[in-house]
């Protein structure tokens, strides 16, 4: 009776999704450096049966990034990820570009390391996430904690992100045992 008419436990199935990667940064856009982030995302999402159906490389121009996000949504992408431009440098304009799409920003910033500069938002129900650089370098990050929920269409709230503060420090163990460790578990 404590739960009322609601079930005590509700299991949401994860579903393979079509996703977009919007790579940002003048260094990649102008060909000075290779995009090494996208292949990592493709690999991580392939583990869940997801397919990248849209990819665009943008300069550090908020209008161009905004347009690419909107184009990805129009192309039917069910998840949209941006890479680059998520820090606090003056030319890091990706959070502004996401906001300019009209997306509802849930949070920009999280009490999780690695992953403090993570942004999650929803554009007409489609998750748009700004991924910090750590997702490319660290074995496990906030992205790994939240991806299963995104694939299960489980809406992420600011309260959910705040709760990650307890257990939100990955210890970077020499041999990773995640998810069988304290990272992401409170």
Where would I find each of the regions flagged by the language model?
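C-terminal and late-domain segments of enzyme folds
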Residues: 184-186
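Short, glycine/charged-enriched hinge/interface segments at domain edges or termini
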Residues: 1-53
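Short glycine/threonine-rich loop/turn motifs
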Residues: 26, 36, 50-182
């Amino acid at each position: 009776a404590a739960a009322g008419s609601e079930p005590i436990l509700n299991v949401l199935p994860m579903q393979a999704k079509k996703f977009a990667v919007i790579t940002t940064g003048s260094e990649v856009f102008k060909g000075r450096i290779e995009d090494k982030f996208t292949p990592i995302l493709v690999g991580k999402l392939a583990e869940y049966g997801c397919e990248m159906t849209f990819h665009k490389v943008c300069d550090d121009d908020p209008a161009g990034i905004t347009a690419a996000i909107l184009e990805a949504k129009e192309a039917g992408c069910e998840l949209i990820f941006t890479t680059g431009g998520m820090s606090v440098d003056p030319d890091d304009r990706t959070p502004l570009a996401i906001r300019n799409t009209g997306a509802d920003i849930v949070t920009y910033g999280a009490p999780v390391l690695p992953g403090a500069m993570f942004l999650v938002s929803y554009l007409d129900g489609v998750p748009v996430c700004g991924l910090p650089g750590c997702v490319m370098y660290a074995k496990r990050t906030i992205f790994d904690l939240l991806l299963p929920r995104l694939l299960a269409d489980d809406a992420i709230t600011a309260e959910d992100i705040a709760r990650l503060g307890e257990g939100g420090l990955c210890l970077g163990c020499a041999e990773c045992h995640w998810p069988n460790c304290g990272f992401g578990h409170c």
